[in-house]
């Protein structure tokens, strides 16, 4: 479930720190969160799609590690990001 280019550019523009920023932790976490939301909707409609479920778990693990890195290095940006994405602070 890939993101279309328009949605991806919109997310990058919203969470980027400057105009050329496409790979910061915030952008990566926001993109992963959107892909996780899309896969979650797909799995609600297709509960027997086990390969997508495994992909979802992999994405959640990637997001978790990026969030822990951001929390450890720059807590202010972490707190702002989880507020915007409506994620739980763990």
UniProtKB/Swiss-Prot annotation:
GO molecular-function term, one example from the UniProt record: rRNA binding
Gene3D superfamilies, per the entry: 6.10.250.3130, S15/NS1, RNA-binding
Source domain of life: Bacteria
GO biological process, one term: translation
Entries under NCBIfam families matching the protein: S15_bact
Record text on subunit structure and interactions: Part of the 30S ribosomal subunit. Forms a bridge to the 50S subunit in the 70S ribosome, contacting the 23S rRNA.
Name of the protein described by the UniProt record: Small ribosomal subunit protein uS15
Species classification: Bacteria, Pseudomonadati, Campylobacterota, Epsilonproteobacteria, Campylobacterales
